[in-house]
Amino acid sequence: QEKQAQIEKKPGRFFEDQPDVNDDFQIHFIYLLAKNTKDKERDLNGWIEKEVKKIDDTFFKMTGDKQRLKFDYREDGKLDISFARMDRKAKSGGWNVSYPDYYLQKQGFNNPKKLYFSFTDAASGDGGQMGPHHGYLFIGRASGQITKISIHELLHGNGFAMPCTKGVRDGAHLGVGILSQELSLKFGKAVYEHNDPTCPDLKDSVYLIPTSDDPFDPLQIACALGQKKRNNPPGNYEIPARYTHKKLLKGRKNEWCTYKLTEYASEMWFKDWKK
């Protein structure tokens, strides 16, 4: 492990979040490998920047050229991309509220004002997974649909579909648009500019720019609901008072947020993740 860490120290590679240009909410990218995954240097060779540019431009088009996602940039103006290698092997199934979330938070990727989106060459069986505030894009499985799957996952990272989103089904999905199986490049009226002030609208997320005059933080909503259903994470979280929709306040059976996992999880939970 030590030897591998030395080999992986390459010029231009950052193992931690670099100083922020401002104190705003932002999406931070990570090139994540499992214990024995081959390092394809996607954080160094421009691959991640290229994919993020496609995500950014497509998202902008989907909003009707109104808003973009807020990304984390370094002081030199470049996209801030970190590198992380887990000390365990990849495993199929859910990575959220599981060892990868736990490991990355232990490495310091635990700022409540960030969404962490990891591009990984390891595999889980899915194309992507995300919730507030960690997410994963599994490059091999997502191949050919990376932009679509990334936007789909980043919507989950922003809390969508919400329990009150019209037509929500199969957890946090919809029957049509980017949050459906078809992954078509439209949000659908239920998600963006839906005109129901009692239920969150994507246009008001703190992770969009220009930012709404009355924005919401998806972590607050997801963690408040997680506490209600699972009694965790620890801390105080509030759903903004203006969101009075009964379905939102009640939540679904399975509500969670990935925040503060290291504060209540024990290593024993992750014994299926082989060292």
Question: How should each PLM-predicted stretch be described?
Answer:
Residues 2-115, 119-127, 142-145, 162-163, ...:
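Propeptide-to-catalytic entry region of secreted or membrane-anchored zinc metalloproteases
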Residues 55, 175, 179:
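An active-site-proximal "capping" alpha-helix that borders the catalytic cofactor pocket
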Residues 127-133:
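Hydrophobic alpha-helical positions that pack around
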Residues 137-151:
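Short pre-active-site segment immediately N-terminal to the catalytic Zn-binding motif
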Residues 153-168:
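Catalytic Zn2+-binding segment of zinc metalloproteases
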